[in-house]
């Protein structure tokens, strides 16, 4: 039996729409992500589901992304004349669906890593990552790696998709705290993409390119202040903020409390606020608990960048 944990991720980081993402883990040691357990069977295949958010999963097994991961993995194995082993997969669904924290990526990554390890790792990291992106595209409507890449590999990942590399890890700022607030409501990735305009002004494109280039430069040259200042979004946030509860006021309040940057995590509704120290992070956490959460399913976590990515649990 093998248990694989895949951590939550925050995509875009405001400045890198579909090109940046980071894996995150709560500083209290709790697991913010999904777990997939795999075990051998005498014959056949079984899929089971458990976890706090299991009730949000599709009733039909064929619509479960873990089942689809199994089918895709099996198809790729057959192309190499390798038989899939009889097995049972159990998804522990601990991530809310449509949260902006890479919920589908967690399930996809945990499932494919478990399947690959169970079969003595026939696929390389890049081959596995390509499969992860394909599965993510089935849910969101387009292939993108800004959740699956950091969830799988850890760290802050920049999507390059050239010279045989899907992504490359950026050096980042270990001193930063990420305060992530999920309000308890759902925003589908497809809906959040549909709300975006079909075209942008030249000035918006230039601004976003300048911000992203400056952000990447700041990461490599260890300029934390510049990196934080460049975490701006003119591509998605102006349109997606309508899907989030009182976002503009909450964003301003977090900045007043000392946040270095505040933005939408992925397609929302989770938001992130970056704090320079633990004291500021705790103030932000308290504020967001009181002013952004909408129901009992909402939560706030103080996190750091997770540099491990998907991993086996003892």
From Swiss-Prot:
Gene Ontology terms describing biological process:
threonine biosynthetic process
For this entry, the protein name equals Homoserine kinase
Any idea where this protein resides? Cytoplasm
Q: Any idea what job this protein has?
A: Catalyzes the ATP-dependent phosphorylation of L-homoserine to L-homoserine phosphate.
Signal peptide per UniProt: none
InterPro entries according to UniProt: GHMP_kinase_C_dom (IPR013750), GHMP_kinase_C_sf (IPR036554), GHMP_kinase_N_dom (IPR006204), GHMP_knse_ATP-bd_CS (IPR006203), Homoserine_kinase (IPR000870), Ribosomal_Su5_D2-typ_SF (IPR020568), Ribsml_uS5_D2-typ_fold_subgr (IPR014721)
Q: Which family does it belong to?
A: Belongs to the GHMP kinase family. Homoserine kinase subfamily.
**Any one GO molecular-function label of the UniProt entry:** homoserine kinase activity
EC class: transferase
**Biological pathway:** Amino-acid biosynthesis; L-threonine biosynthesis; L-threonine from L-aspartate: step 4/5
Q: What is its main location?
A: cytoplasm
Residues that bind ATP: 96-106
NCBIfam families associated with the record: PRK01212.1-4, thrB
Mention any Pfam family matching this sequence.
GHMP_kinases_N
Catalysed reactions, semicolon-separated: L-homoserine + ATP = O-phospho-L-homoserine + ADP + H(+)
> What is the organism lineage in this UniProt record?
Bacteria, Pseudomonadati, Pseudomonadota, Gammaproteobacteria, Pasteurellales
Could you list this entry's UniProt keywords, alphabetically sorted: Amino-acid biosynthesis, ATP-binding, Cytoplasm, Kinase, Nucleotide-binding, Threonine biosynthesis, Transferase
Q: Which organism is it from?
A: Pasteurella multocida (strain Pm70)
**Which PROSITE patterns does the entry mention?**
GHMP_KINASES_ATP (PS00627)
Q: Name one GO cellular component term.
A: cytoplasm
Listed EC numbers: 2.7.1.39
């Amino acid at each position: 039996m093998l248990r694989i944990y895949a951590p939550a991720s925050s995509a875009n980081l405001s400045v890198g729409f579909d090109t940046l993402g980071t894996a995150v883990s709560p500083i209290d040691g709790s697991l913010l992500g999904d777990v997939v357990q795999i075990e051998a069977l005498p014959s056949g295949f079984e899929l089971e589901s458990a976890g706090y958010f299991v009730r949000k999963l599709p009733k039909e097994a064929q619509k479960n992304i873990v089942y689809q991961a199994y089918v895709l993995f099996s198809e790729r194995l057959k192309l190499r004349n390798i038989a899939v082993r009889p097995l049972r997969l159990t998804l522990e669904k601990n991530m809310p669906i449509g949260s902006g924290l890479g919920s589908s990526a967690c399930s996809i990554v945990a499932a494919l890593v478990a399947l690959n390890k169970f079969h003595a790792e026939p696929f390389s990291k890049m081959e596995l990552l390509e499969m992860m992106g394909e599965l993510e595209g089935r849910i969101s409507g387009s292939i993108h790696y800004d959740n699956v890449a950091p969830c799988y590999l850890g760290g802050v990942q920049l999507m390059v998709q050239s010279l045989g590399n899907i992504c490359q890890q950026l050096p980042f700022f270990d001193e930063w705290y990420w305060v992530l607030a999920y309000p308890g409501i759902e925003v589908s990735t497809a809906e959040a993409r549909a709300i975006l305009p079909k075209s942008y002004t030249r000035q918006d494109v230039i601004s976003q390119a300048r911000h992203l280039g400056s952000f990447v430069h700041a990461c490599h040259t260890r300029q934390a202040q510049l990196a934080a200042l460049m975490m701006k979004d003119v591509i998605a946030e102006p349109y997606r903020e309508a899907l989030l509860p009182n976002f503009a006021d909450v964003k301003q309040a977090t900045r007043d409390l000392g946040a270095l940057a505040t933005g939408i995590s992925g397609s929302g509704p989770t938001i992130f606020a970056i704090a320079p120290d633990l004291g500021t992070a705790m103030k932000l956490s308290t504020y967001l608990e009181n002013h952004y959460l909408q129901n009992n399913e909402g939560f706030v976590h103080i996190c750091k960048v997770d540099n491990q990515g998907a991993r086996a649990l003892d």
